[in-house]
């Protein structure tokens, strides 16, 4: 019975051809063990941690401003003609055209005249003298070529331009007189330039034609007197002599043929306490006894030493 249950012997030729096929799990385990180990294999979550964390030494990046959206004008669906805006219209006007527009508006609406006067900037001495010089240039360019420039024919050619210049002079002069002009130096500067322009007006062969210029000299002399008296109230008139206005007015009087003598007399009385002389030769020589000469030379008070009283 035991012999029947015994395992039959295995023939020898079965042992020669037996091959053990390795399992897939063992080969993969051996191959993974033979590979070089990387840092990611030890701690796979460390890479994620380092990538999510901010570097401590990296500089902070300033936020970039977002670009503003450009406002693009859309084309009008229906284009049609329209007048210019006021700002564009004023850009096309030159000085003469703009002056004409303002003048016509003030004529039609007189209440605007006061508004324009208060809104416009105050004219300076240079701007006023420039206007007078423009009138003078127009006058000089109107003389006939050749012939006698002081004849009646030449006078008739330029008569209107002379009237325009003298009218402008009569309008500008009161503007620079006190009390409308508070600065004496500004008033004197204007009168100096206006008198120079008046000197350059032509003299005519016919004495009657010179009447307009002679009247203008009388008016400018009165203006000098007003300013000189106002300057005499401020600091005793020292500004007149310190600025050399005594010499300038004396020169104007000589050029005008003595027609500014009244202004010279008023100036002499205003500067009488200072020992000033209105004669040009004496003033240019520099009288050592005058207070002005002593102040400018630094010798004022040197001839009279200071007396010290006893205690």
Swiss-Prot record:
It is found in: Cytoplasm; Nucleus. GO terms for molecular function: proteasome binding. Residues 278-287, 296-311 have a biased composition (Polar residues). Residues 38-50 have a biased composition (Basic and acidic residues). Residues 1-84, 277-311 are annotated as: Disordered. The keyword Iron-sulfur does not apply. Binds the proteasome. Involved in ubiquitin-mediated protein degradation. Regulatory factor in the ubiquitin/proteasome pathway that controls the turnover of proteasome substrates. Targets proteasomes to the nucleus and facilitates the degradation of nuclear proteins. This is Tethering factor for nuclear proteasome STS1. It comes from Paracoccidioides brasiliensis (strain Pb18). The gene is STS1.
């Amino acid at each position: 019975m035991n012999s029947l249950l015994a395992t039959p012997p295995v023939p020898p030729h079965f042992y020669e051809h037996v091959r053990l096929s390795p399992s897939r799990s063992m080969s993969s385990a051996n191959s993974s063990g033979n590979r070089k180990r990387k840092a990611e294999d030890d701690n796979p979550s460390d890479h994620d941690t380092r990538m999510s964390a901010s570097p401590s030494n990296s500089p902070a990046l300033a936020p970039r401003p977002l670009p503003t959206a450009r406002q693009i004008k859309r084309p009008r669906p229906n284009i049609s003609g329209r007048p210019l805006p006021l700002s564009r219209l004023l850009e096309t006007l030159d000085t003469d055209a703009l002056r004409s527009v303002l003048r016509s508006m003030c004529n039609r609406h007189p209440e605007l005249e006061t508004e324009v006067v208060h809104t416009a900037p105050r004219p300076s001495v240079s701007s006023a003298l420039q206007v007078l010089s423009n009138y003078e240039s127009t006058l000089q360019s109107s003389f006939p070529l050749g012939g006698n420039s002081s004849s009646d024919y030449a006078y008739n050619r330029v008569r209107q331009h002379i009237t325009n210049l003298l009218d402008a002079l009569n309008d500008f002069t009161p503007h620079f007189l006190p009390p409308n002009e508070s600065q004496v130096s500004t008033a004197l500067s204007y009168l100096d330039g206006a008198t120079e322009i008046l000197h350059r007006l032509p003299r005519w062969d016919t004495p009657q034609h010179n009447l307009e210029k002679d009247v203008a000299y009388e008016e400018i002399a009165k203006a000098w007197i007003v300013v000189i008296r106002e300057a005499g109230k401020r600091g005793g008139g020292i500004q007149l002599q310190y600025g050399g206005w005594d010499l300038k007015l004396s020169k104007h009087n000589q050029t005008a043929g003595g027609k500014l003598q009244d202004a010279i007399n008023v100036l002499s009385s205003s500067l009488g306490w200072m020992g000033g002389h209105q004669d040009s030769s004496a003033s240019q020589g520099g009288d050592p006894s005058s207070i002005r000469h002593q102040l400018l030379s630094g010798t004022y008070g040197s001839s009279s030493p200071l007396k010290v009283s006893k205690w």
